[in-house]
Amino acid sequence: MQQKWKPHRRRVRAILFEPNPAEAARLRPTLPAWSEGLVVEHGLAEVAGAYTLNLAHWPGCTSLLASDPGVLAGYKIAPLYETVDRVNIECVRFDELHKAGKVPAPDVIKVDVEGYEHQVLTGFGDLLHGVIGIEAEAWFYPVFKGQKLLHDLVALLAPFSLHLRRIEAVPGFEGDLVCVNAYFTRGKAGHPDLTLEQQPKYALLQRVWGLNGI
């Protein structure tokens, strides 16, 4: 769980996805028993099936997509994206897991999968109609081959009435704005159409994400 959510952890049920069994086992004890949190041993994608995960020199740069040396050339961070190994993993669509009763419908989504965010969010399908907020890593330049960029996320989420509210720069590219955290919430102009159950959840995410007054 992100540090900013920890003060509110008693109001959050975290559903984490980790395709590596050893890493999933490490994560489970970090979820308090009372939270009903889950660690699901799957990757997420637009199409279910077997995928190759490119393990990068720096684990945080690992991706289902191959990095693009041409785009990364000239940045000191470039060597961290170099692939050092590859492993096969199974990926599923989130909406299929939900249909099978294995995960609850999401209220808020946090996705940071190194260039594969668009495909993961597509796999939520019509469940996005019930989502009140999304925090996604997003990109202005294609650091990974074939990746979608921020404007693609905006276009994907607009039909679900999820609108871009804020971006914050992700450091690492020596002053260039290459990667950001993008925050989307339901409704235009900060005036979402919410159910009574959603209203306190929306108020909480506004506070945690620092969107009050924006």
Model regions: which residues?
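Phosphate/nucleotide-binding beta-alpha loop and adjacent structural elements of enzyme active sites
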Residues: M1-I214
